[in-house]
Amino acid sequence: MKNLQPQEAYAWLQAHPDALFVDVRMEIESLYVGRPPGVINVPWYEYPDLQPDAVKFADIVAQEATGKDQPLLLMCRSGQRTLAAGKALEAAGFTDVQHVVHGFEGELDDHFKRSTVSGWRFEGLPWEQM
């Protein structure tokens, strides 16, 4: 799995129009916090269980993808869930997996707020909100 900084990920998407851009956050996070245009939501885990099912996740991504060699870009809140999700996809046979380091919102700052230090939104990249 390749690690891409948000600006690199955006440029990578522009260079790979055939890529599948997957938001692995819970659907409610994606809708209310915001998400990049064109991303599809396939949660790594969902409320109330909050327990990932790697096989189910990989199966859903496989249904959305054109094949296991399709380029994939994964995004979550801060770049942690995508590490586990990406490993699960590689274990399931996906061969071209990237993830956005720092995710959509990035790390917490000294005041426990996100999107102020790093992340897709902090970098001023395109996003939308419900």
Which residues does each predicted region cover?
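Rhodanese-like catalytic fold shared by cysteine-dependent sulfurtransferases
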Residues: 1-19, 27-71, 82-130
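Short, surface-exposed ligand- or partner-binding patches at beta-edge/loop junctions that are enriched
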Residues: 75
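Conserved G/P- and acidic residue-centered "switch" motifs that form tight phosphate/ATP-binding loops
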Residues: 23, 79
